[in-house]
């Protein structure tokens, strides 16, 4: 400490300048009494140390560990506990750094091998680089527990963290940055990871999170992964955001986001149980689906948004695969697809249930489907809005599938000639079914080709388009309209048209002058108004209502 006194004043009644040259000195108070107000605390200096091995390891705050010792396989490590039944107790304090750079082998950051071991740290940094491979943290021992506190970071040029054998890991505001390997791997029955709030996983070349309760003792229960406000950002071919295998439970809390940017890199791929609210999924690669469920149930709540630039939005395909995608009136969900479909159920026990959801499909003029059920799949929707660009079809069912829609339904195709609702006949399959009941605003045509379509239009419905029923395979098209309007745009036929205080308008959107629009109905009932263009003034431009 140096004290500079001005004007030759050597008394301690004036402290003009105090220069503190040691971090161990804390200035509490300036005053005329001089130096008795200065508190001296013990000096703690961060130390550099080499690899740590043993069952009880305690590292001081701020220390730096550099891997300089090889394990029996000849690979450098930072911290390691012995294998076996002796528990390890590893306390890495606050702000400790573990660096391992193995220029010729497998770099290992922290390896916990003993049964019932514990690892404790806060604001830990692990940075590993290996020539052949690398792992930031590997919890190998049975029933190990790791608490990484707040703000810890794992960096690796291969795998980030691997945990298994019914072990647990907790952290918050946690960061994993890695390349080539998986960011976080959760193996075995009973293994669980809770990343708290605000954690981030960024990988280049592989999957962000893999979880699978596929081995070990099933009495320990499912493998579990929990986080909220989680960000996953992955790049690379087939690099999925989250890969959920059987016997796994994932809870993504609220405001989590998943982004992938590789071909076939699905945002969420699941055989397990997944839940999330206000989830955002954005995938940009070719054939990359936003959410693909192959088994189990995935439940996604309000204010969730799925976007797939070149693939499907939601898809179920597999045994008892279910997606519940539920927005609310105040917080609607959305799906955008620049690929094949917005939502698709593709096998006999595959189901998608949606509420309060807006679906947009735009494949730049190529075929795309808003809702697509096939091979016995089923889709239900309540209060849906579907927008289809040129080349798209709104709702489509084939190969013995079913779609059921209730409440408000909006289908807005780019022209009335495009298919808003349609079924397809396929030899050897029972007729597919599409049922809709509620207030409908439909811009597009309805075509029953070897299928059964039943539309029950509630008051305020408006349909602009044409209809077709080919009656193949027992197919039918039945429409009931109550205080609704059908603007017929071209020649149409259907099996049943039941009208109550409604209007069928051939004039406003019909064929051009000089041509006729024909409507064939097998069973017509009710009391409503037909508006037709008639040649009552000599030039074919007269419009006359018929009751």
From Swiss-Prot:
InterPro entries cross-referenced by the UniProt entry: Autotransporter_pectin_lyase_C, Pectin_lyase_fold/virulence, Pertactin_central
Taxonomic superkingdom: Bacteria
Pfam families: Pertactin
Family from the record: To B.pertussis prn N-terminal region.
The name this protein goes by in its record: Putative uncharacterized protein YcgV
Gene source species: Escherichia coli O157:H7
């Amino acid at each position: 400490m140096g004290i500079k006194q001005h004007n030759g004043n050597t008394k301690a009644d004036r402290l003009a300048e105090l220069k503190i040259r040691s971090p161990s000195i804390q200035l509490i108070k300036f005053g005329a009494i001089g130096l008795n107000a200065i508190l001296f605390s013990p000096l703690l200096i961060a130390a550099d140390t080499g690899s740590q091995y043993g069952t009880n390891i305690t590292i001081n705050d701020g220390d730096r560990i550099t891997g300089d010792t090889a394990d029996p396989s000849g690979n450098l490590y930072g911290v390691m506990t012995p294998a076996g039944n002796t528990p390890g107790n590893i306390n890495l304090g606050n702000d400790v750094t573990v660096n391992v750079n193995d220029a010729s082998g497998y770099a290992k950051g922290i390896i916990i091998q003993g049964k019932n071991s514990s690892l404790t740290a806060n604001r830990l940094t692990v940075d590993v680089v290996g020539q052949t491979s690398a792992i930031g943290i590997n919890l190998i021992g049975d029933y190990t527990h790791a608490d990484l506190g707040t703000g810890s970071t794992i960096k690796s040029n291969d795998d980030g963290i691997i945990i298994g054998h019914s072990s647990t890991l907790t952290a918050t505001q946690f960061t994993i940055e890695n390349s080539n390997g998986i960011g976080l791997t959760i193996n075995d029955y009973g293994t669980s990871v809770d990343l708290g709030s605000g954690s981030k996983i960024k990988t280049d070349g592989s999957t962000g999170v893999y979880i699978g309760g596929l081995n070990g003792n099933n009495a320990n229960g499912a493998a579990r992964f929990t986080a909220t406000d989680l960000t996953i950002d992955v790049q690379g071919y087939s690099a999925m955001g989250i890969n959920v295998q059987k016997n796994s439970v994932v809870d993504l809390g609220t405001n989590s986001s998943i982004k992938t940017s590789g071909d076939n890199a699905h945002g969420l791929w699941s055989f397990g149980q997944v839940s999330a609210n206000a989830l955002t999924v954005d995938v940009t690669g070719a054939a990359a689906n936003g959410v693909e469920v192959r088994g189990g149930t995935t439940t996604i709540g309000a204010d969730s948004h799925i976007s797939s630039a070149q693939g499907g939005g939601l898809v179920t395909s597999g045994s008892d695969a279910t997606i519940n995608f539920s927005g609310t009136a105040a917080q609607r969900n959305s799906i955008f697809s620049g690929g094949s479909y917005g939502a698709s159920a593709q096998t006999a026990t595959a189901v998608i249930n949606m509420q309060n959801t807006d679906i947009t499909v735009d494949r730049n003029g190529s075929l795309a489907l808003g809702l697509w059920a096939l091979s016995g799949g089923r889709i239900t929707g309540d209060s849906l809005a579907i927008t289809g660009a040129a080349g798209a079809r709104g709702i489509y069912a084939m190969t013995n599938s079913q779609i059921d829609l209730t409440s408000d339904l909006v289908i807005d195709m780019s022209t009335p000639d495009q298919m808003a609702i349609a079924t397809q006949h396929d030899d050897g399959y029972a007729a597919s079914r599409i049922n809709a009941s509620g207030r409908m605003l439909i811009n597009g045509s309805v075509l029953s080709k070897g299928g059964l379509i039943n539309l029950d239009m509630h008051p305020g419905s408006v349909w602009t388009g044409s209809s077709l029923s080919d009656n193949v395979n027992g197919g039918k098209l039945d429409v009931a309209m109550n205080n609704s309007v059908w603007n017929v745009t071209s020649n149409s036929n259907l099996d049943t048209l039941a009208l109550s205080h409604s209007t069928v308008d051939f004039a406003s959107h019909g064929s051009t002058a000089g041509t006729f629009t024909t409507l064939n109905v097998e069973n017509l009932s009710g009391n409503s108004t037909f508006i037709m263009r008639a040649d009552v003034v000599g030039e074919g431009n007269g419009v006359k209502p018929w009751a």
